[in-house]
Amino acid sequence: FRHVPIVTDIEEVKAQSTPLEVFNFMESELLAILPDLPKNRGVSRFDQAGVASILVRLYLNAEKWIGISKYEECEQMAQAILDGKYGEYSIDPDYRGPFRSGINGYRSKENIMEFAIKKNYFEASWLYNMWMHYQDRYSLDNDWQGWNGGNLAPSRDLYGNLYQDKLGMPFEKFPDEDIRKKAFRVISNDGDYEGFFLMGTQYKFDYEKGYGFTDEVITGTEEYNGKPLVYVDQVGRFSEGETGLAKGSHVIYGEENTGYRLIKFPWLPQSKDLFQMNSIPEIRLAEIYYSLAECKYRSGDKIGAARLLDAVRKRYYKAEDWSKFSYESNISKLTDDEFVDELGREFIGERHRRIDLIRWNRFSEGAWWDKTPDATNQDVFPIPYRALNANPLLKQTTAGF
């Protein structure tokens, strides 16, 4: 919103402050509380590193929101976090570690701030419901039905060809050698798993083994009622034949099997008391590495940026493949476009993408599947109608509204 009132007394009705005034207020509040907080207490609570990380976010995005570069301050705060000034953290050697934190007593040292989840007490039900099909309960071993609402934007058109949009194709932006680019499956009785995506033909959970799948296919309930449920990396009315394809590929023309499903935050077997028991990370040390890398990249230190990115990325590749994908070993690959792609890969599903694209001038201006460049600036939310009615001192400050 940018232009919001700064209210410190609930009885006050105040007009909007400038973006710079809002920024300065937020910064001063965070800096004031920082030394009074404990260290390494980031399970459902903000500690010193959590507040320092919010300051990193504030400084990293300052130039876009207030027109004043704060990359030097961002670099200093990020480096202090990496140096352990605000607590001891480290990159998890296992790519799944930050997202299964809380399972069987495990706590990932990468997570600076995570929201603890526990079934029947504090659940992330919306996160499951948004991505999961009604029938996924039979493959994932739980009794939830899901809304079948969300999926990855498609990488392929109606005829299986890759789209060419720079900012699209989230699944295919992962190299085939990246070990995250696998179909999700539980691989042990302890809830170990692999892969970040539900894709292709879906099979029933193997209750006899306690993990994995049987050979029994799960069937659809709508367009593919009684037929195998096969997730495709496309959007279109395929069930209607040529008539359906003629409608094109748009948001309104999805089917029940449309799109690969992100399962980065794993839904583990309910029969093992693991379902809805893993935390949801809000801030990972990886974000601090990437923020510091971006500061160095913007200042011209590409090698320094590459080393920081590689420190996180190395866990995604087998040793024999790493030299081909290391930025330090292939520095010419680290361009603006590649940096934006890498942010998308690392933080897919973690609610970073919009603000990252805005910071890199690719949100309103950018194009991807079913989204053309916007004629008006969509970077800033409009002041809500209800807020305008409730406070006569507020003005609509967002252009185009």
Question: What positions do the PLM features span?
Answer:
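Extended, hydrophobic/aromatic-rich amphipathic alpha-helical segments that build helical scaffolds
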Residues: F1-I6, P19-L37, S44-L82, M113, ...
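A conserved hydrophobic secondary-structure block that centers on an alpha-helix together
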Residues: E12, N40-R41
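Flexible glycine/proline-enriched surface loops and loop-helix/loop-strand junctions
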Residues: P38-K39, N61, Q270-L274
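C-terminal substrate/ligand-recognition segments
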Residues: I187, G191-K314
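Long, intrinsically disordered, low-complexity segments
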Residues: F25, P98-G168, K272-L285, K296, ...
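An aromatic- and glycine-enriched ligand-binding surface/loop that stacks and positions planar moieties
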Residues: L31, R45, A49, I54-V232
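Acidic/His metal-coordination segments adjacent to aromatic residues that form catalytic metal sites
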Residues: I10-L20, P266-L274
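Short linear capping/connector segments at secondary-structure termini
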Residues: T8-V13, K324-E328
